[in-house]
UniProtKB/Swiss-Prot annotation:
The lineage of its organism: Eukaryota, Metazoa, Chordata, Craniata, Vertebrata. This is Protein-associating with the carboxyl-terminal domain of ezrin. InterPro entries: ARM-like (IPR011989), ARM-type_fold (IPR016024), CIK-Related_Protein (IPR051177), Kinase-like_dom_sf (IPR011009), Prot_kinase_dom (IPR000719). Its main location: cytoplasm. Belongs to the protein kinase superfamily. Signal peptide: none annotated. GO terms for cellular component: cytosol; endoplasmic reticulum; Golgi apparatus; Golgi membrane; lamellipodium. GO terms for biological process: inflammatory response; neuron development; protein localization; spinal cord motor neuron differentiation. A lipid is attached at residue 2 (N-myristoyl glycine). Residues 505-545, 604-648 are annotated as: Disordered. May be myristoylated; myristoylation may target it to Golgi compartment. It comes from Mus musculus.
Amino acid sequence: MGSENSALKSYTLRESPFTLPSGLAVYPAILQDGKCASVFVYKRENEDKVNKAAKHLKTLRHPCLLRFLSCTVEADGIHLVTERVQPLEVALETLSPAEVCAGIYDILLALIFLHDRGHLTHNNVCLSSVFVSEDGHWKLGGMETVCQVPQATPEFLRNIQSVRDPASIPPEEMSPEFSGLPESHGHARDAYAFGALVDSLLPIFNEQVSADVLSSFLQILHSALLNPMPECRPALSTLLSHDFFRNDFLEVVNFLKSLTLKSEDEKTEFFKFLLDRVSCLSEELIASRLVPLLLNQLVFAEPVAVKSFLPYLLGPKKENAPGETPCLLSPALFQSRVIPVLLRLFEVHEEHVRMVLLSHIEAYVEHFTQEQLKKVILPQVLLGLRDTSNSIVAITLRSLAVLVSLLGPEVVVGGERTKIFKRTAPSFTKTSDLSPEGSPMHVVCSQQSRVSKVLEDPSSNVFPKWLSGNVPSSSRKRIQEECYSSLSQTGDQFSHTIKFPMNGLSDVKNTSEDNGSFPAGSNKPEEWPDWSEPEEPEQQPASIHRWPREPCDVAESQHTNLTAEEVTWDDGEASFGTEINSTATASAPVPVTSGGQSTSAALVPLTEESKPLQSSPSSKTSHRQHEEVKPPQVSQERPLKAPSGLGLGEEFTIQVKKKPVQDPELDWFADMIPEIKPSGTFLILPELRTEVMVPDKDNVSSLMQFSSKFAATEMTEGEAEGWEGEELAWEDNNW
């Protein structure tokens, strides 16, 4: 009261006023803080009446009494500022029968409060003293005529007769012998006026209230309230229990007003069936009168209300929702009545309120404007990220996901964004081979499938069983790679080399010149030996030393067949644009008889600057069945620049020509005569795929081209193997 008066600084009158029958002008006004108000302008000569009215409004506080804000004296009169209200005479045409019934009930409560609590009498209960607030409640005004029961003398009544409604004056006051009412019947004057007011409003209920209830209420009005004898008029509190005031709307309103006084069982029963009771009411009545009572902290704290009723109030009706219980309000009413209430609730920092609001944010968030979302909703939602409650943080994150679709990620997330996750469509099904059976593509697919099965299962029975014995690891690895290479070959039907991109370069052309030659498999390059050698100077020429084998028995030499496979070397590095093609013709092995030994070596130039191949006899071992192979030393010169006419990667292509030979695996199981296979020396270049020349008995020469870009290369040696129990003695010479 006092704070409201001191806080008020100014107001602005709006629009044209409404003039009451008593001559009082009512102006709508806007306060300085933006709130709405009403200003009653009295004439200066009525200052005493205004002071009395202001005094009663300040001291009497009831929901059904007009709320006082301030009183000032202006040039045009005395201004009494109250809450924003509208005269009942103006608003009556827009009210429904349920609202009128609730309004009558409000005035009844206000009079009971004056009589029982204040021991006062209003003395002017009529249509012009009743006002309708913005929330639909009826307010009793005209407090300038209020006085205590003993003070209602005939003289006082004559002084206020100018402002009183003639229809509200009881018949006893017309008698010249009237001297006043006893204090025990001080309510009789207001009871008569209230009966007259209700009687004028009853025609509105002709079709809305049952005939029995309406006739019963009319009988009470005429026989009790409008009784000419003041002693026969009962107290107004006796009307509260009449069936006229028992309807769904009024009962819901009364229950919600006294929610804090109800027990848990009463609240559970009420909210459990609230949806059924409210569904029969008009949407306008629900929006104007029930929404403010239902959307508050008290109702949000009731679990039954949150589960059974609020979901139907926190969202508008949807046109296409078959099989679902529709919401209570249309989108237009939801926008005008519910959204303002929700905006205020988002500023309430109570956990249970925020949980309910965010749980149903998808249903109503689209009805906020962009400005409301940015200035009110988003800042309030973001506060939940810093809360200590895990449930608040979790539901806040889900709500932010909803806001992203409306405000955009730049507004919700903020800051610059970068592309982190790429759009990919992985295929989890293998491409089936639909090519013809005899086509080259079909052969390639078959080879790849055969090789992949072996690579995936190295423990399969593809390799000979004698590899699992006491065979050196380097020899076992070489033989396994030969088996891998043989699996990828299909004979003379397909002579194209399968090439795969190396180091990101896929422009490698086919190096097969002879269509009848055996195809070169795409073997995996061998791993480098574990020994370390000092780097050799770059300018040294490359040389290959072929060491002759020791003489063996005739029986052993007849069954000895050293085979190797042809391997294509591809250099995957494209940073060097040079190529040096070197050819080496290897002579066929010469049979050794028991009468002596002969050594032959073919000297083949590898490059223009390379030295001839030199052969030197090897030292015999102490044991007859062992042989010694000296690791050759190979050095390369720095590659020269090749002509610029070659394509990308062609300078690293190694071309090999050879005649087709029979499957080398057939010789491995030729007979069971124990023998010692002489070692074969293979040239291993780093990062290149190797192909081993397979000499036959007819002294077939092969052509091998390789790149000499590296300064030093390593050599691997083929190991000799024999029957189980035989040992081989190895000596490292000339390192």
